[in-house]
């Protein structure tokens, strides 16, 4: 009888998993940068805390300011220090021009540089235009927008001498699209976007980048107080069918702070699960 046919060749090995083709390099470029957080909650909770912890995990030293460094701020300071980086909180009124100049110079003396500025403050005093008081308007603009100007103004000469720096303004999707009942908040966050774009044009030739992040519905202590029904209605409007996390925003902030975004400036990145396109 004829000999049996040779066995078929073995199948080719399967391709490597998809993620291996696009593995992200480590963000070693944050070490040993100094990051300054200007925030209504310092880096004590929510998005600010998530960004501070993410930056610290990548090796960045952390300085943050708040009107008062309370127990939350002190606890976060300890949590960041446990990651092996230098961290310090500073009590300062961000809406006061002179106070801001002093605290930024003090941070420069203590840390040696200010490489990344995160303007993360945000308060709300919502109301329809017909019922909104002047005090409601002024408070939101002062905390959300004027204090960002104060800190950028104070950090600019430091970053110019360094010939490098990354400024990250925390805006909001309502600063892009508006929202009824939030004209003061929307205006302040739209101002943060315009401020970032203008700074990017002014200081780009000095090696300084400026960008804005516009978060959508992010699950924080504030939004956790909403009813399940309200949160479900929000989720229906989001293509990814879920709210975002502070860590989602922190990942984008880390990208903008690092050299992975060295050719990215004057941009607004919406972190909203596709809610606004």
Locate predicted features.
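Alpha-helical segment proximal to the catalytic Tyr-Lys
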Residues: 157, 201-205, 262
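C-terminal substrate-recognition "lid" of short-chain dehydrogenase/reductases
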Residues: 149-152, 208, 242-271, 276
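Substrate-binding pocket helix/loop in short-chain dehydrogenase/reductase
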Residues: 128-129, 133-141, 223, 234
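Conserved glycine-rich Rossmann-like NAD(P)H-binding loop of the short-chain dehydrogenase/reductase
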Residues: 58-75
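Active-site helix of classical SDR
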Residues: 152, 188, 196
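Residue(s) in the substrate-gating loop at a strand-loop-helix junction
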Residues: 172
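Short, small-residue-biased leader/transition segments that mark boundaries at the very start
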Residues: 21-36
């Amino acid at each position: 009888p004829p000999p049996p046919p040779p066995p078929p060749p073995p199948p080719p090995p399967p391709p490597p998993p998809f993620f291996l083709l696009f593995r992200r390099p480590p963000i070693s470029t944050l070490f040993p940068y100094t990051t300054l957080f200007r925030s209504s909650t310092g880096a004590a909770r929510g998005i600010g805390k998530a960004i501070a912890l993410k930056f610290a995990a990548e090796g960045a030293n952390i300085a943050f300011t708040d009107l008062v460094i309370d127990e939350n701020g002190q606890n976060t300071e300890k949590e960041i220090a446990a990651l092996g980086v230098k961290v310090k909180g500073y009590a300062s009124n961000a809406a006061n021009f002179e106070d801001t100049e002093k605290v930024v110079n003090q941070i420069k003396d203590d840390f040696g540089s200010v490489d990344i500025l995160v303007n993360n403050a945000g308060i709300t005093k919502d109301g329809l235009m017909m019922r909104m008081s002047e005090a409601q308007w002024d408070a939101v603009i002062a905390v959300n927008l004027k204090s960002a100007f104060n800190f950028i103004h104070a950090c600019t000469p430091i970053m110019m001498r360094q010939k490098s720096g990354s400024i990250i303004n925390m805006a909001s999707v309502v600063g892009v699209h508006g929202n009824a009942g939030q004209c003061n908040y929307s205006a302040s966050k739209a101002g943060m976007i315009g401020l970032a774009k203008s700074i990017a044009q002014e200081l780009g030739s000095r090696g300084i980048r400026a960008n804005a992040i516009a978060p959508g519905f992010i699950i924080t202590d504030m939004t956790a107080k909403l009813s399940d029904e309200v949160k479900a209605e929000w989720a229906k409007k989001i293509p990814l069918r879920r709210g975002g996390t502070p860590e989602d925003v922190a990942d984008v902030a880390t990208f903008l702070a690092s050299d992975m975004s060295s050719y990215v400036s004057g941009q607004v990145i919406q972190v909203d699960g596709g809610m606004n396109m």
